[in-house]
């Protein structure tokens, strides 16, 4: 960014999924989270199945200070992931984990994370495939 450019804020989409019995509660808690912080959010549901559905929350953080906006951006991601897991949802659906959600994967998978680690070690003994990106 050029020094004379004005910082406009940060926008992103958070994708989560949950069973039908849990999605309503998670959705309302996510909306409440953003509304309490006066953060613009637009959410929608997609990819519905007999066992559950995915939800997207597109948010926009606009602060005068660029670093403050960046810090808030990462706090939002962490808080929404924690909230989703606490309420029994999943931190992803079909878009994968990625770098931001990576630190929450172990928490979501529990003991299954060790199995995934062992599989990666067996297939990639030299640790050259996506080093540090997933596990």
Show which residues each predicted segment covers.
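A glycine-rich phosphate-binding loop feature that marks nucleotide/adenosyl-phosphate handling sites
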Residues: 46-54, 58, 94-102, 132-135
């Amino acid at each position: 960014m050029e020094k004379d450019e004005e910082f406009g804020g940060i926008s992103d989409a958070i994708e989560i999924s949950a069973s039908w019995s849990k999605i309503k509660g998670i959705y309302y808690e996510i909306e409440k989270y953003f509304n309490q912080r006066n953060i613009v959010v637009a959410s929608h549901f997609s990819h519905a199945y007999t066992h559950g559905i995915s939800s997207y929350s597109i948010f926009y953080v606009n602060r005068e200070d660029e670093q403050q906006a960046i810090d808030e951006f990462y706090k939002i991601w962490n808080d929404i992931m924690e909230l989703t897991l606490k309420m029994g949802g999943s931190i992803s659906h079909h878009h994968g984990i990625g770098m931001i959600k990576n630190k929450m994967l172990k928490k979501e998978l529990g003991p299954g994370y060790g199995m995934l680690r062992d599989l990666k070690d067996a297939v990639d003994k030299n640790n050259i495939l996506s080093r540090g990106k997933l596990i």
